[in-house]
């Protein structure tokens, strides 16, 4: 049979959503799909996911004695944010997911060219979940992630692009990065007739 490198499998997975690429990667990295799912679940908890349980490496429906394969829009946003901005492999992730094509693989993420600042995105589909999409965008130092679930079924494959633009547009128009000054009283202590004063601290926050 034909042989592929791990790099080629990653492009096949992220650009074309090939399920067999996901399985091959899982078996190569962890030895089995089950062991790989365990790694995924541990990583999901590590980055703050609250309601995610992986069974399959490709996202297809599955169930076992511990539950069913599932996640939430919030957790998907956390995963995308980690991949784009926090992961030690973020540069490689962006290189792959931003490629319009690689060899025989063509990127199905048309949204990359539909809005300024789009950094990455991943499409998905199952009969139960419908068309799904998760993406990351950065403009003027502001960072946003969105997740669309059940965003249409066959014959409505392009709904997700319009909805993604609407959500990102809302975020850009509504929220802003603010510098918040927080007054914090540490403690009052009498020392030789002197009283300590309240201290102030500056916290930079992104309001999203």
Walk through the language-model features, giving the residues of each.
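Second-shell loop/turn segments in exported
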Residues: 1, 7-12, 22-31, 60-68, ...
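Extracytoplasmic/periplasmic mature domains of Sec-exported, cell-envelope-associated bacterial proteins
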Residues: 1-6, 16-19, 36, 50, ...
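Conserved catalytic neighborhood of penicillin-recognizing serine enzymes
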Residues: 1-23, 73, 106-120
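Short, functional N-terminal and low-complexity linear motifs
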Residues: 4-12, 39-48, 103, 131-136
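Solvent-exposed, polar/charged alpha-helical surfaces in well-ordered, non-transmembrane soluble domains
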Residues: 4-11, 23, 27, 34, ...
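Alpha-helix boundary/interfacial micro-motifs
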Residues: 18, 24, 34-35, 141, ...
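Mid-domain, small-residue-enriched loop/turn segments at the edges of structured enzyme/sensor domains
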Residues: 27-81, 85
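Domain-terminus/edge residues, biased toward the C-terminal soluble/receptor-binding domains
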Residues: 49-50, 67-208
């Amino acid at each position: 049979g034909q042989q592929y490198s791990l790099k080629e499998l990653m492009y096949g997975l992220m650009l074309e959503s090939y399920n067999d690429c996901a399985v091959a990667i899982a078996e190569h990295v962890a030895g089995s799909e089950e062991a790989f799912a365990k790694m995924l679940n541990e990583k999901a908890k590590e980055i703050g996911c609250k309601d995610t349980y992986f069974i399959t490496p490709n996202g297809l429906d599955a169930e076992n004695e511990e539950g069913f394969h599932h996640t939430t829009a919030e957790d998907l946003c956390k995963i995308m944010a980690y991949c784009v901005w926090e992961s030690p492999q973020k540069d490689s992730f962006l290189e792959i997911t931003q490629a319009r094509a690689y060899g025989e693989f063509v990127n199905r993420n048309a949204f990359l060219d539909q809005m300024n600042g789009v950094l990455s995105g991943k499409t998905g589909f199952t009969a139960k979940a419908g068309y799904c999409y998760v993406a990351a965008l950065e403009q003027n130092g502001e960072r946003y992630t969105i997740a669309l679930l059940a965003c249409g079924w066959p014959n409505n494959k392009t709904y997700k692009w319009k909805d993604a633009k609407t959500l990102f547009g809302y975020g850009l128009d509504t929220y802003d990065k603010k510098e918040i000054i927080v007054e914090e009283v540490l403690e009052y202590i009498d020392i030789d007739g002197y009283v300590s004063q309240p201290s102030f601290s500056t916290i930079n926050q992104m309001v999203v």
